[in-house]
Amino acid sequence: MAGPNGDPHVLGGGTGDEGDEGGDTFEEEEYAAINSMLDQINSCLDHLEEKNDHLHICLKELLESNRQTRLEFQQQSKQLNTGADVQGSQPPA
């Protein structure tokens, strides 16, 4: 049986001419195990991607919330400064 790049797999250093059916079974089991591991890795990566997307959304919401809070704080600060300037320019009673 040829490998993924077309090179023949030779088990046990033989030439592959022995007609060993056990070798094909071993290779199939090996490929099945590798496929299973790749499926698990793929599932883990999908899960990580979902968590990353969720985290990204949460961080964007937090950033927007912080921007809103900062703008509100700046507006309040301006109003207080404007009020203090108006009171400071009036003569004391």
Swiss-Prot record:
<feature type="region of interest" description="Disordered">
    <location>
        <begin position="1"/>
        <end position="26"/>
    </location>
</feature>
<dbReference type="GO" id="GO:0030054">
    <property type="term" value="C:cell junction"/>
</dbReference>
<dbReference type="GO" id="GO:0070161">
    <property type="term" value="C:anchoring junction"/>
</dbReference>
<feature type="region of interest" description="Disordered">
    <location>
        <begin position="74"/>
        <end position="93"/>
    </location>
</feature>
<comment type="similarity">
    <text>Belongs to the UPF0184 (EST00098) family.</text>
</comment>
<protein>
    <recommendedName>
        <fullName>Bublin coiled-coil protein</fullName>
    </recommendedName>
</protein>
<dbReference type="Pfam" id="PF03670">
    <property type="entry name" value="UPF0184"/>
</dbReference>
<keyword id="KW-0963">Cytoplasm</keyword>
<dbReference type="GO" id="GO:0005737">
    <property type="term" value="C:cytoplasm"/>
</dbReference>
<keyword id="KW-0965">Cell junction</keyword>
<dbReference type="GO" id="GO:0060090">
    <property type="term" value="F:molecular adaptor activity"/>
</dbReference>
<keyword id="KW-0175">Coiled coil</keyword>
<comment type="function">
    <text>Essential for intermediate filament organization in intestinal cells, interacts with intermediate filament and regulates intestinal lumen morphology.</text>
</comment>
<dbReference type="InterPro" id="IPR005374">
    <property type="entry name" value="BBLN_eukaryota"/>
</dbReference>
<keyword id="KW-0206">Cytoskeleton</keyword>
<feature type="compositionally biased region" description="Acidic residues">
    <location>
        <begin position="17"/>
        <end position="26"/>
    </location>
</feature>
<dbReference type="GO" id="GO:0005856">
    <property type="term" value="C:cytoskeleton"/>
</dbReference>
<dbReference type="GO" id="GO:0045110">
    <property type="term" value="P:intermediate filament bundle assembly"/>
</dbReference>
<dbReference type="GO" id="GO:0120219">
    <property type="term" value="C:subapical part of cell"/>
</dbReference>
<feature type="coiled-coil region">
    <location>
        <begin position="59"/>
        <end position="80"/>
    </location>
</feature>
